[in-house]
C-alpha cells in the first residue's frame, strides 16, 4: 500500500512539474518581478541574460525534456550511482581570529609585510557555504543550514551535516549571496543570521527583493560594481588595518529562479573581496561560458583564496561539465586563469543534484590537477579549518587546453569514476 501511495504522489508531482514547465503564458499574479531598471549588456528590462550566450544554460540537463528529467530523478530510473545516506563529519568550533591591534579608536596602517602575513582561515561548511576568517572580519558564503535544498522543506536531502553547528558560528560580519537557487539562498538560515548578527549581506541585482520580503536587508549591486565594508569597531570604520575592504560583484555564467515563472528575474554573480593579505574570490554557481570571467576577477588584484565549484555537472555517462555547472577539469582551468595561490573545491558532497557518484568530483579534480601540473587546489574535509598560506609569487598565466585535458584524463582510473 505504501508503494501505491508513493507512486500516486510521484505521478501527481510529475503532472505538476509537467504543467509548470509547459506553461508559456504566465498570468501576472503568478510572476515575480524582483528588479526593474534600464537595459544593459546583460538585462533586457525584464530578465537578465548571460552576455556570452544562454543556449547552454537554457537547455534541459540531459538534452531531453525537463519533465522526463524530473520523472527519472523522482522514480530513481536515471541510473545514478548510489550515494551514502549520511556522511560522518567532525564539526568545527572556530575561535575568533584575533590579531593584536591598538585599542579603539587608534588604528595603525599595516606595512606591506604585515598585510601579507595577515592570517586567514577557511572552513568548508558544506556545498557552497564557507566561513572565511581574517582578524576582525568573518565572511560567510551562500549560507545553507537547511536539511533539504528546495521549497517548503522538499528537495534533495543533505547527506553531510553542516561543518559548523549554527550555535558555534562566530559573529558573522559579511555574507556573500551569489544567486537565488534554493541550494544557495536559504531564507530560513539568512533570517537566523540577520536576527543574531545583523551582517552586511551583499548580493546581485534582484535577490535583495527576495530577502526584503522576509524582513532581511541586503545590498544589491550589478556586475562591475563594488560595496565598501565597514568592519567591527576593532577594525575601524571602512578600513582594515588602514586599508579599505570592498566587495566587487563580478560576472560568472549561470541563471536564477525560485520557481518556474521567475527565471532570470534576478542576477547571478561571483565576488572578489579585497583584503590586505590578498583577495578572496567566490565563484558562486557557474558554468564556463566564454571563460573570460576568471581573468576579469584576477585583474582586481592577487587572489589568495578562491572558492571554486566542482560538482553537479554530470547528467549523462562520461559528461565532464554542463552549461550551468563547471566540472573538475574546467574548475582547474578557472583556477589557472585566476592565478590564485590556493583554492578550495565547493559545491559537491552535500546535496545530490546530478548523476555523478559521491566521490567522483574530488577524484576527477585530483586527476585534472595532475594533468595540469598544478598544486594548491585540493579537497578539504567538511568542518576542518584550513589555514590559508600567504600569497607567494604570482602563478604563470597559462591555461591547460581542453584537448590536453581530455587526452590526459582518458585513463582507466578516470573512466571508472561514474
Give residue spans per PLM region:
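A short acidic, amphipathic alpha-helical/loop segment
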Residues: 188-193, 214, 292-296, 334
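Metallo-beta-lactamase
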Residues: 2-168, 203-284, 304-311, 366-384, 389-395
Amino acid at each position: 500500500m505504501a508503494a501505491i501511495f508513493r507512486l500516486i504522489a510521484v505521478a501527481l508531482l510529475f503532472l505538476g512539474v509537467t504543467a509548470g514547465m509547459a506553461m508559456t503564458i504566465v498570468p501576472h499574479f503568478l510572476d515575480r518581478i524582483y528588479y526593474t531598471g534600464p537595459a544593459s549588456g546583460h538585462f533586457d528590462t525584464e530578465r537578465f541574460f548571460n552576455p556570452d550566450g544562454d543556449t547552454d544554460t537554457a537547455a534541459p540537463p540531459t538534452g531531453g525534456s525537463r519533465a522526463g528529467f524530473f520523472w527519472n530523478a523522482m522514480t530513481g530510473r536515471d541510473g545514478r550511482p548510489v550515494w551514502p545516506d549520511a556522511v560522518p563529519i567532525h564539526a568545527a568550533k572556530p575561535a575568533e581570529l584575533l590579531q593584536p591591534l591598538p585599542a579603539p579608536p587608534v588604528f595603525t596602517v599595516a606595512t606591506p609585510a604585515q598585510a601579507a602575513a595577515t592570517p586567514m582561515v577557511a572552513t568548508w561548511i558544506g556545498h557552497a557555504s564557507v566561513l572565511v576568517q581574517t582578524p576582525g572580519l568573518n565572511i560567510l558564503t551562500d549560507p545553507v543550514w537547511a536539511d533539504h535544498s528546495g521549497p517548503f522543506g522538499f528537495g534533495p536531502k543533505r547527506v553531510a551535516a553542516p561543518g559548523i553547528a549554527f550555535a558555534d558560528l562566530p559573529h558573522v560580519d559579511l555574507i556573500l549571496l551569489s544567486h537565488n537557487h534554493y541550494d544557495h539562498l536559504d531564507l530560513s538560515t539568512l533570517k537566523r543570521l540577520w536576527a543574531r548578527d545583523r551582517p552586511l549581506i551583499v548580493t546581485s541585482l534582484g535577490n535583495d527583493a527576495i530577502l526584503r520580503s522576509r524582513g532581511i536587508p541586503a545590498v544589491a549591486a550589478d556586475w562591475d560594481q563594488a560595496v565598501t565594508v565597514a568592519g567591527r569597531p576593532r577594525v575601524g570604520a571602512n578600513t582594515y588595518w588602514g586599508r579599505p575592504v570592498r566587495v566587487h560583484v563580478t560576472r560568472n555564467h549561470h541563471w536564477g529562479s525560485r520557481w518556474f515563472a521567475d527565471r532570470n528575474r534576478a542576477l547571478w554573480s561571483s565576488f572578489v573581496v579585497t583584503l590586505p593579505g590578498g583577495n578572496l574570490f567566490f565563484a558562486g554557481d557557474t558554468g564556463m561560458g566564454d571563460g573570460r570571467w576568471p581573468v576579469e576577477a584576477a585583474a582586481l588584484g592577487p587572489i589568495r583564496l578562491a572558492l571554486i565549484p566542482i560538482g553537479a555537472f554530470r547528467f549523462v555517462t562520461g559528461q565532464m561539465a554542463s552549461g550551468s555547472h563547471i566540472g573538475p577539469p574546467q574548475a582547474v582551468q578557472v583556477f589557472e586563469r585566476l592565478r590564485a595561490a590556493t583554492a578550495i573545491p565547493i559545491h559537491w558532497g552535500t546535496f545530490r543534484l546530478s548523476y555523478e557518484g559521491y566521490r567522483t568530483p574530488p577524484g576527477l579534480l585530483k586527476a585534472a590537477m595532475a594533468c595540469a601540473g598544478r598544486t594548491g587546489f585540493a579537497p578539504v574535509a567538511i568542518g576542518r579549518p584550513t589555514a590559508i598560506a600567504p600569497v607567494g609569487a604570482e602563478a604563470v598565466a597559462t591555461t591547460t587546453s581542453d584537448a590536453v585535458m581530455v587526452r590526459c584524463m582518458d585513463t582507466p582510473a578516470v573512466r571508472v569514476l561514474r
